[in-house]
Amino acid sequence: MNNTDNLIDKNPSKSNNKITGELVNYQNESYYKISNSHAMRPFFMSIVSDSNHWMFLSSNGGLTAGRKNADFSIFPYYTDDKITELAETTGCKSIFRIQKNGKNYLWEPFSERQAGLFTIKRNLYKNIYGNKIVFEEINEDLNLTFKYQWNSSDEFGFVRKATLINNSEKDLGISILDGLQNILPYGVGSDIQGIRSNLVDAYKKCELETDSGLGIYALSAIIVDKAEPSEALKANSVWSLGLDNPTYLLSALQLNDFRRGLELKQEVDIKAEKGAYFVNATINLASSQEKNWIQVANVNQTVSDITRISEMIKRNDHLEDTLSKSVEQGTKKLIDLVASSDGLQLSNDELINTRHFSNTLFNIMRGGIFDDNYTIGKEDFITYLSKANKKLFLNIKAPLQNLPNEFTLEFIKDLADKDADKDFKRLCLEYLPLKFSRRHGDPSRPWNKFS
């Protein structure tokens, strides 16, 4: 393919790049839209969930994400400046070869590699609940729109929904290469990734289960400086739906081959390279039609977890519907959590309503909420005692097992009154049955380690 075919003489006026912000209805949900976000300096965002997902993104597409804390990452956890700078090599990457009017065009949305080559417009959408974000690029020269959405599912992990729309009056032949790059294997903590990333690369092992198209990202062994066995028994995983019979890539080694128009070879087993998950397929996109596909990434997966997902993909038991329902269930749970702390309000100003929801959400993420009328769970209470006073816990460990699975605040007060140990009394009265709280911190504040 001749890359000079891409050179379309355009000189967009500055008026086309006016930055605006407004609330819009998108896919039956309220989103705040920033038009022409590419005309702004990159800024940092966070995406929340009702569960233990965390995701920090730059407006240029760079991101880090994982579950629980920075040691369970699917993309490297760095400071925000590095995340912004590594947008070309970490996270989402999409490249399209388009046949139009007898010519071939190469389009790489959201990439600075093609800055000034096409007349484009980039928009950002974030839903009012803060758990979904959409990146959109409109190519006015090729009359194409590409967008992708990040959201999450407690059961399945991180969900990326990609959409390619043909805005022209002609059918287009399009070769797609789309996916994720710089995927971490399980067992790589943020500390070792930050200072010994080349050593981590040497231990990486990426495998494809060809029947289901599921990518498995693991270490050949857990990296330890001890003379002892250290098997890596878990992995991170990525899988996809929506494209028929795609070619799968597990690294970024063939990206330039695709840019040059060369045929790609499926990768099944890649060692000592940064992990990636790309799907390659050729489609015919009719005028005014769109093509959708999905990629799902998760961390901390056991052999049984991976086997279960693989079987679900092969059976294809309405998996896309199951995935969508899981995502929407997460949104409903998030709303319920905020509602429990009076985070829902209705006024004449939708932006004020959204601001109040957001403020309440981040307050309860910091401080937590009292769930189910202050009901206390035995396991959480026992864990609390074991960490608060280890010596005391060893003495009362056996009697604690006789507690009911759930009990009330009055029950724990009565328990404290009947016990002669002053430390136990104090710990009972100090215990707070909070949920949803987490230690704060993010890539812009690296001195704080969140959890």
Model-derived segments and spans:
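Anionic coordination/interaction segments
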Residues: M1-S451
